Structures are given as C-alpha cells and as structure tokens.
C-alpha cells in the first residue's frame, strides 16, 4: 500500500512512519518545504511534478493545539486550508488524526480555533467514503515534546525532583506504539466497512495523579507529587473503541523510561 503521510516531521510521524515502513507500507512523507499544504498552488505544482498515485492519505499535519501558547483565528483557517487541499485528492483510505479538543464537556462543539478546526475536519472525514478519524486525547512516546506531561514527569523523577500537577483530572493517555496498532488496523480494514471514528484510549481511566504514581514506581526512589489546585478538573477521556492487544499504559511508560535512561 502506498501512503502519503502529511506532518511526518511531527512527534507522531517520527514515531509511526518507521513502523509503517517496517511492516511493508510504502510511505511518502514530504516536508512542509517540499509540500506547503496551506498554499493551493504549491499543492497542485507538487502533485503535477510528482504525481498522485497513493492508496491512502494519513493526515497528521496541523497547527496549534499547544497548551503553552494561545491560538488565534489563523490557526483555524490554516488548518482548514491544509485539510481541504489534501482531501480533494481521491484515495481509497483517508485517515485523519482527530483530537479530544474537537469536543468538550458533554459532547459540545469546541470553541477554540484549534478545536473547532479539528471538529470541522472530523466531520468532513466522516463523509469521505474511506475516511476514519483517530481521536487522540493524549499520546506519549520517546520522541514527544519535552513540555508534555509524561515526558516532564519522567525527567523530574530521574532528577529526583517533585512531579507537579496543576489540576488533577481523569486523562486518557495513549502509548504511541498502540496508536500505531490502531492506524495499521484502520489502513488494512476493508474500505466501506471501516469505522468512521475510533477513540485512541484504554478501557481503564486514570487521573493524572495515578499516572504520576506509575512514574514514581519506575525505580527504587520516590519523589513528592504536588497538586496545585484542590478541585479536580473536567475529565479528558473518550469511550473505549477497540481492543487490539495493546501494550498498555503502564508498560508503555516503562518502555519510554527505559529508552530515556
């Protein structure tokens, strides 16, 4: 199967593309310099030059959504331009990495530029004959950004420093190698009978403090776990979708820790 993978230089792309290739998929992952998805003319010129002979598109290219900065409306417009410029090309399978941020509260539509763009893209993906949304709430792995919760917690633990949680809440954190299992399943299931939406979550739900305790048990020493807010926050979780013999949260945390030692 020939796959066009957008956003391949991001955390998820750098983790799963080698796994796709190892399993025999033929993956093309142009950089943003090679393929500027925001610019319609650039997209046309790229495919006029290189052709478009793909069986599937995995769309991971996205702007915004970082908790360390606030998004403006340009994030929404640029995300939608990238999406529309690539979904217009016909493929048997179109996989979109959705986000838990596309809905909030009791299934309410997102009110942030990033979240609303994800909501709009997920709705369009549902209408694609071979479309599937893989909804991610939290994803972790060796190559994730240093400011992400689990990476920060592991580094604090290694340095024997306190692990700080701003506000405790139920949080679906999913190992990137398990995300790959969901992606592979979505690519291989017959088009037309594929699920339109899959939540990339585990059956059991954990608070951030539970996850911090898992980190705190990775070696012989212990560190303080500090929670700044007394009141618990809203859950950031999804319903369990599919069982694919996952590695699981605890083992995934251990594997990341061992890789970072």
Predicted regions and their residues:
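N-terminal Rossmann NAD(P)H-binding glycine-rich loop of SDR-like oxidoreductase domains
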Residues: 3-23
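Conserved Rossmann-fold NAD(P)-dependent oxidoreductase catalytic core, especially the SDR/UDP-sugar
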Residues: 84-114, 132
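C-terminal substrate-binding subdomain of Rossmann-fold SDR/epimerase-dehydratase oxidoreductases
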Residues: 161, 165-261
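NAD(P)-dependent short-chain dehydrogenase/reductase
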Residues: 111-115, 119, 123-172, 176-185, ...
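SDR active-site strand-loop-helix element
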Residues: 6, 30, 57-61, 94-100, ...
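NAD(P)H-binding glycine-rich loop region in Rossmannoid oxidoreductase-like domains
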Residues: 40-78, 101-106
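Adenosine-cofactor binding site in Rossmann-like domains, unifying the SAM/SAH pocket
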Residues: 27-46
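NAD(P)-cofactor binding segment of oxidoreductase domains
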Residues: 50, 70-95, 120-123
């Amino acid at each position: 199967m020939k796959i066009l993978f957008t956003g391949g230089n991001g955390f998820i792309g750098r983790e799963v593309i080698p796994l796709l290739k190892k399993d025999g998929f033929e993956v093309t992952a142009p950089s943003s310099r090679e393929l500027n998805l925001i610019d319609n003319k650039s997209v046309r010129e790229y495919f006029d030059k290189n052709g478009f002979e793909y069986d599937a598109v995995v769309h991971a290219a996205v702007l915004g959504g970082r908790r360390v900065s606030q998004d403006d409306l340009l994030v929404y417009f640029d995300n939608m331009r990238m999406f529309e410029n690539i979904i217009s090309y016909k493929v048997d399978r179109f996989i979109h990495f959705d986000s838990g941020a596309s809905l909030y509260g009791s299934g309410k539509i997102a009110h942030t530029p990033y979240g609303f763009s994800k909501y709009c893209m997920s709705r369009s993906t549902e209408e694609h004959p071979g479309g599937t949304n893989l909804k991610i709430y939290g994803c972790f792995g060796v190559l994730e950004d240093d400011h992400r919760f689990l990476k920060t917690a592991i580094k604090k633990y290694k340095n024997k420093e306190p692990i700080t949680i701003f506000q405790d809440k139920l949080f679906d954190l999913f190992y990137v190698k398990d995300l790959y299992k969901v992606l592979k399943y979505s690519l291989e299931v017959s088009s037309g009978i594929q699920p339109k939406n899959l939540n990339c979550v585990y059956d059991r739900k954990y608070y951030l403090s539970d996850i911090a305790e898992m980190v705190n048990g990775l070696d012989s020493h212990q560190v303080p776990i500090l929670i700044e807010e007394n009141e618990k926050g809203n859950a950031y979780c999804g319903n369990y979708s599919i069982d694919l013999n996952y590695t699981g949260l605890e083992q995934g945390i251990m594997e990341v820790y061992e890789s970072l030692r």
